[in-house]
Amino acid sequence: MEVEDSGGVVLTAYHSHARSQPQGAEPRCASRASHPLSRKSIPRCRRINRMLSNESLHPPSFSRSNSQASVDSSASMEEFLREIESIKESSVGASQEQPPTAAAAAAEVKPVDEGELEAEWLQDVGLSTLISGNEEEDGKALLSTLTRTQAAAVKKRYNTYTQTLRKKNKQPVRDVRDIFGVSESPPSDSCEHATQLDGTKEEKDLPGVTKTSRPLPDDASLSSTTLSNGAQDEEGGFVALQSGSVSILEAIPDIAVHTNGSADAEQSVQSTLSDDDYHGKNVPAEAEELSFEVSYSEMVTEMPDRNKWKKSDIKKEDYVLTKFIIQKTRFGLTETGDLSVEDMKKIRHLSLIELTAFFDAFGIQLKRNKTERVRGRDNGIFGVPLTVLLDNDRKKDPAVKVPLVLQKFFQKVEESGLESEGIFRLSGCTAKVKQYREELDARFNADKFKWDKMCHREAAVMLKAFFRELPTSLFPVEYIPAFISLMERGPDIKVQFQALHLMVMALPDANRDTAQALMAFFNKVIANESKNRMNLWNISTVMAPNLFFSRSKHSDCEELLLANTATHIIRLMLKYQKILWKVPSFLITQVRRMNEATMLLKKQLPSMKKLLRRKTLDREVSILKTSKVPQKSPSSRRMSDVPEGVIRVHAPLLSKVSMAIQLNSQTKAKDILAKFQYENSHGSSEHIKMQNQRLYEVGGNIGQHCLDPDAYILDVYHINPHAEWVIKP
């Protein structure tokens, strides 16, 4: 019997440990009520791979040629099954020791209507203003930055939400035109956009919106972007927003996607960065260019015959994955940790909108089930939410981004286990694992746990248990069905990478940072493959059941498909770990626009507030005029004091604390750092300080941005002239 999957785990030559079935017997997805490890006996959340019993294998929807089967793939399947059995045994053992609590019980899917899910989606992407009706600056600013595909995705969800509300509400009062049959205008001119938005492509002038220029071209840059309820004047400044009763959603612009910054397209590519820099062996000669400058959903929409792709063969060998050549623009590349917390929150909102629009382009609905929130434990280590662990750890180290206990597990394995054969296939000593778990829960936060006595095998076992027992999966399992549908349409690895890239950007901060550290750690394990026999395929096979789990009920066949896809996703994460956590530049451009729009909107007082506060404001202005001499604001004073093309860089931690630097088209961030290093090279301590220093742009249209050493500062200066420039760790 052969069960194969081109999208993840290769299921070949499966050998049942039970009695062999008669020849010709077909695999079946039967009920497992009689199985000793049935649902009732597993109090913990239902793992997506619990279905891999010896009698319930069923072919997934993917197929592979028989020539691709190998002994290695059969061994990988056996590893997968052993990991499932280990999870089942640990789950049963835990249930016998203590009764399940409400926090640990499986959360069942609640029957909810589509409107509730769309309302939750709108809240998750930062558009709760559309539900509450409040004129919030952040929501309006976010809407003003959306591309065509992103705006269409928001409109679609908002329409579903409003339609559901109308069905729930009582019969509305009949319109006078319904009574007398008056119809003076065609239906297309009816004014119902406050409750439902249509998908027409015709552009209409909106009341209260000032337009000063013709429609934007497709290659418009950031400097020519028109914001919702506002426009640019000829000098590039924004015209003040007009007050009125314009609905927030009416102002969603039908704008083209823009390149990052104002640099010409021909000059945008300064150098290339290949994933081969990080995985330098067994790379095929074919390579594909990967751009972060253009919205992925816009790129997919413009692809001809995107629904007629030929299915790509996904083989076991890691070297057959596409080699990507990444465009490195004049603004450099940005890691997730290079941006401020507030800006990363905006990135997360935009990424979820972009991910939804990306799947919409393929006709795939990004469905999410509404489940009961599992709170988890408030203390200890295992079963505690990542956010709670980080809150406790930040009392010791405010800068920590990955739970300290997880870092200890990594360190323990790296000390003596990287060359240990089958390090993540071994189960370790059960008695010791149980003892260490209890001691960690009781003593770790008090720094009383003795790490010297722990073996690397037990550390590896507890690392898997740590992720398996999280209240919620490290990676959202609800995205997997959409990823399965994407793979069934047969797009190449590049499209799969783009979907996965947006998934990573949409993760909560704690999950995203932890996942990055985990993938970096596993790549260290894979680097010692010749000694530990743990390659990319083995790691993804063993870790899939621990990193992805579902609290929803699925048939065994569905869960098999979910498991295979989860394995493939981990494999992609491991292969492209160095580039998946780089923020796409088109999202950074949208964040800059959003910050500019927020500052503009905050200057505008609602008409009612203006009316109520007019006398108070006039009195305050008169007092200021008589008591103080008008002074320039710090930003205007700074701009007037510093000539064009000259920036003042501050280095508060160095002996040379400030320096004015004349920029030219070739000045890079590393050149500025080199100048400060030369000026502060009098002592060895100053030299050590400079090794950890980076150049930041702070303020203006960005919260804080740690610049790539290869970024051209004049280009950054042009898109953010009001920023301050600071050198710090």
UniProtKB/Swiss-Prot annotation:
CDD domains: RhoGAP_ARHGAP18 (cd04391). This is Rho GTPase-activating protein 28. Residues 221-231 have a biased composition (Polar residues). GO terms for biological process: negative regulation of stress fiber assembly; signal transduction. GTPase activator for the Rho-type GTPases by converting them to an inactive GDP-bound state. Signal peptide: none annotated. SUPFAM superfamilies: GTPase activation domain, GAP. Keywords: GTPase activation, Phosphoprotein. PROSITE patterns: RHOGAP. It comes from the Eukaryota. Residues 384-581 form the Rho-GAP domain. The lineage of its organism: Eukaryota, Metazoa, Chordata, Craniata, Vertebrata. The modification Phosphothreonine is found at residue 164. GO terms for molecular function: GTPase activator activity. GO terms for cellular component: cell junction; nucleoplasm. The modification Phosphoserine is found at residue 70. InterPro entries: Rho_GTPase_activation_prot, RhoGAP_dom. The gene is Arhgap28. Residues 1-78, 180-234 are annotated as: Disordered. Residues 63-76 have a biased composition (Low complexity). The record marks 425 as: Arginine finger. It comes from Mus musculus (Mouse). Pfam families: RhoGAP, Ubiquitin_RHG40_C. Residues 37-49 have a biased composition (Basic residues). The keyword Phosphoprotein applies. The keyword Zinc does not apply.
